[in-house]
Amino acid sequence: MAVASTFIPGLNPQNPHYIPGYTGHCPLLRFSVGQTYGQVTGQLLRGPPGLAWPPVHRTLLPPIRPPRSPEVPRESLPVRRGQERLSSSMIPGYTGFVPRAQFIFAKNCSQVWAEALSDFTHLHEKQGSEELPKEAKGRKDTEKDQVPEPEGQLEEPTLEVVEQASPYSMDDRDPRKFFMSGFTGYVPCARFLFGSSFPVLTNQALQEFGQKHSPGSAQDPKHLPPLPRTYPQNLGLLPNYGGYVPGYKFQFGHTFGHLTHDALGLSTFQKQLLA
């Protein structure tokens, strides 16, 4: 029975042998001939006469057991502090990843990174407090209850959060009535303004837009200047004019000036009748 315990797990101790196709090592197999693979491996595994094989003190292939990883208690896990590598010392041109920076617009690099890191740290601390086990929370609460409060402790003043008004609703004299450079939204009446910085242009456009849509604008409308015309309707064109003249194709028998004058003076319906 002691010899049978040394066989490889999975082999029959009564009749151990390998099946054809086994690619592992079988000792002394290369020196055995004249029998089938199963018979030869069976004799070698049981041990030839006068040779104790396999040795009693060890097995051919001991079972392999993966090492157990040490269990680390949840409370002793190290706190993740990867975001501390990002600080205010970053300069414009930094191409690394800054968490939550892709959701902030219309600010310079320093302001975007500072606000993104602040939001990420606040969110990370909030998630970490929610993941604490109830026992740890209970111990933390009891420790807080046991700590005596110092006398005369001043309460921290609460900062009132003032919502920033929209530039559309601001007064025209408000210096904040503009959009910052980098704003990609639509700004009414800013299409035909140029020659100044983006904040100045958006301020002028917002003022013009507010004047057009103010309640008193309908009573005192501003007349737009007449649109320029490509062709004069009361004069003809000079000879050698190489541009297109609508209706000239069907005119003949007069000079170029008379023909173009007649063609340009006709209405669209009259030109269709001539065609």
Swiss-Prot record:
Its predominant location is cytoplasm
Q: In which tissues is it expressed?
A: Expressed in airway epithelial cells.
Name any GO cellular component annotation. Answer: axonemal microtubule
> Could you tell me which cysteines form disulfide bridges?
none
Membrane-spanning residues:
none
Where do the segments described as Disordered lie? 62-84, 125-169
Instruction: Please give the InterPro entries that the UniProt record associates with this protein.
Output: CMI2A-C-like_dom
Q: Where is the composition biased (Basic and acidic residues)?
A: 71-84, 125-147
Q: Where in the cell is it found?
A: Cytoplasm, Cytoskeleton, Cilium axoneme; Cytoplasm, Cytoskeleton, Flagellum axoneme
List the keywords (alphabetical). Answer: Cell projection, Cilium, Cytoplasm, Cytoskeleton, Flagellum
The entry sums up its family as follows:
Belongs to the CIMIP2 family.
What's the stated role of this polypeptide?
Microtubule inner protein (MIP) part of the dynein-decorated doublet microtubules (DMTs) in cilia axoneme, which is required for motile cilia beating.
Q: How does it assemble?
A: Microtubule inner protein component of sperm flagellar doublet microtubules.
State what protein this is by name: Ciliary microtubule inner protein 2B
